[in-house]
């Protein structure tokens, strides 16, 4: 059974999880989290992330040794999935050999569960981030098959390696391509089809990012690009099971226990991610009910995206990117005081600016948290470029556009315009979607603005709790 709900480790939560030893989750906290995700939240998949962070390579052993009664009757790989996100050696040269190290986990973990009498591989899929070609996916698949599992066929001093170290199983894995930029999203179907043909697969899981495209191209353009990729995938001659990476912040997808419209917005998506804010910034009962709804959601045909929709996306993307230079200074000024929620390696993204400049910005969660903390929702950036005709075209393909924008606008603080002049964007957004501020959030962001160069960490968290997400 293909999972419907994938829990992830994205650090977008304002509240501290009930099982955490401190406000920054460490490796042991994340092992506990994986158990609670399956046992309490009833998710059917947990992403185990080796990209950009130190992850515990002994996760399978630790889960079974600590929670044997639970997992012995509900085996990993069968009732629940643990799916690793591995580094992409084509992009992350400094982490290239970590790919080999993480793939070695797979047969080692299988050995451990077999020693307990469980005859099912706990891990048999990996996610490849920043996929840009079919060859990248094929290389990971072939490397595991030929050099990880395949080493058992080699001979050492006249003896097969498998006779010495045991079998290396499973013999093959599947690789889930993760598409994160515009060009790869536009080629997602082509790349997926080539990989499926090469690997002789009749079905394939494909992962589409929503957060990084929004960071690079803006809220509306990212949504249209993802919808175009989903439509193209639906036209393939193989069964595809798309995964959509969505956060609770509208800019990053808008999926929360209080907003399940995303299930209808992307009707062909099979698996939705639930990130940390979804799990920890809402009442437990609401989270459980929302996850149940997501697991039961009926799939329908993808929305058709035509050339007019893509032209509007390009226009709004260009408007968004023109404004990034004036936003970067305040984002970087505030970002260092956004509280950390996970033990991650420092990672500063490079935003490719349209005139060849490179503007340094933090990752998407911190970017959004920095702007929301002063009452500047990132969803409005560039919206002044939207004509009435553009608006009508967007509403054709983005069904809950008004609802998402009204939600974002409720968190706007006009005082933020004194820090970053986006007055034209605000006025156009107000004209299209109205402006009814959340008074409690307005008050909290006023406090942050008054103390903007001081110790604002607690205020940032308090504002995040009111929103239902940090960033």
Curated annotation (Swiss-Prot):
It catalyses: oxaloacetate + phosphate = phosphoenolpyruvate + hydrogencarbonate. Its EC number is 4.1.1.31. Pfam families: PEPcase_2. InterPro entries: PEP_COase_arc-type, Pyrv/PenolPyrv_kinase-like_dom. SUPFAM superfamilies: Phosphoenolpyruvate/pyruvate domain (SSF51621). Keywords: Carbon dioxide fixation, Lyase, Magnesium. Its cofactor is Mg(2+). Signal peptide: none annotated. One of its GO terms (molecular function) is phosphoenolpyruvate carboxylase activity. Belongs to the PEPCase type 2 family. Homotetramer. Catalyzes the irreversible beta-carboxylation of phosphoenolpyruvate (PEP) to form oxaloacetate (OAA), a four-carbon dicarboxylic acid source for the tricarboxylic acid cycle. This is Phosphoenolpyruvate carboxylase. It comes from Archaeoglobus fulgidus (strain ATCC 49558 / DSM 4304 / JCM 9628 / NBRC 100126 / VC-16). The gene is ppcA.
């Amino acid at each position: 059974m293909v999972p419907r709900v994938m829990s992830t480790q994205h650090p977008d939560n304002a509240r501290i999880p009930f099982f955490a030893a401190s406000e920054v989750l460490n490796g042991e906290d994340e092992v506990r989290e994986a158990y609670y995700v399956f046992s309490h939240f009833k998710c059917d998949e947990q992403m185990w992330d080796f990209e950009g962070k130190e992850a515990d390579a002994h996760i399978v052993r630790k889960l079974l040794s600590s929670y044997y009664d639970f997992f012995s009757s509900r085996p990993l790989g069968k009732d629940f999935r643990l799916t690793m996100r591995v580094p992409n050696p084509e992009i992350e040269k400094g982490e290239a050999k970590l790919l080999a190290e993480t793939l070695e986990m797979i047969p080692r973990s299988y050995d451990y569960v077999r020693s307990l009498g469980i005859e099912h591989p706990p891990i048999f899929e990996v996610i490849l981030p920043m996929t840009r070609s079919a060859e990248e996916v094929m290389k990971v698949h072939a490397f595991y098959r030929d050099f990880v599992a395949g080493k058992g066929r080699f001979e050492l001093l006249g003896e097969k390696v498998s006779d010495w170290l045991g079998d290396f199983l499973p013999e093959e894995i599947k690789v889930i391509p993760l598409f994160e930029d515009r060009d790869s999203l536009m080629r997602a179907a082509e790349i997926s089809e080539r990989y499926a043909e090469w690997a002789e697969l009749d079905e394939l899981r494909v992962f589409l990012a929503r957060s990084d495209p929004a960071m690079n191209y803006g809220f509306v353009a990212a949504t249209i690009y993802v919808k175009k990729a989903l439509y193209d995938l639906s036209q393939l001659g193989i069964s595809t099971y798309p995964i959509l990476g969505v956060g609770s912040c509208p800019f990053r997808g808008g999926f929360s226990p209080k907003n399940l419209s995303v299930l209808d917005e992307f009707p062909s998506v099979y698996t939705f991610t639930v990130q940390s804010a979804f799990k920890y910034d809402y009442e437990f009962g609401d989270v459980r009910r929302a996850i149940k709804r997501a697991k039961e959601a009926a799939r329908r045909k993808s929305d058709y995206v035509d050339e007019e929709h893509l032209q509007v996306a390009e226009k709004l993307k260009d408007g968004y990117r023109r404004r990034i230079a004036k936003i970067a200074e305040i984002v970087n000024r505030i970002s260092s005081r956004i509280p950390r929620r996970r033990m991650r390696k420092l990672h500063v993204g490079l935003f490719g600016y349209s005139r060849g400049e490179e503007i340094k910005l933090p990752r998407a969660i911190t970017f959004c948290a920095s702007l929301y903390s002063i009452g500047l929702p990132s969803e409005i950036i560039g919206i002044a470029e939207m004509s009435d005709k553009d608006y009508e075209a967007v509403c054709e393909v983005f069904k809950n556009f008004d609802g998402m924008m009204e939600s974002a606008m409720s968190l706007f603080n006009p005082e933020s315009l004194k820090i970053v002049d986006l007055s034209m964007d605000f006025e156009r957004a107000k004209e299209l979607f109205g402006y009814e501020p959340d008074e409690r959030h307005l008050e909290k962001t006023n406090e942050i603005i008054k103390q903007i160069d001081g110790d604002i960490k607690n205020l940032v968290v308090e504002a995040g709790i009111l929103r239902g997400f940090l960033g």
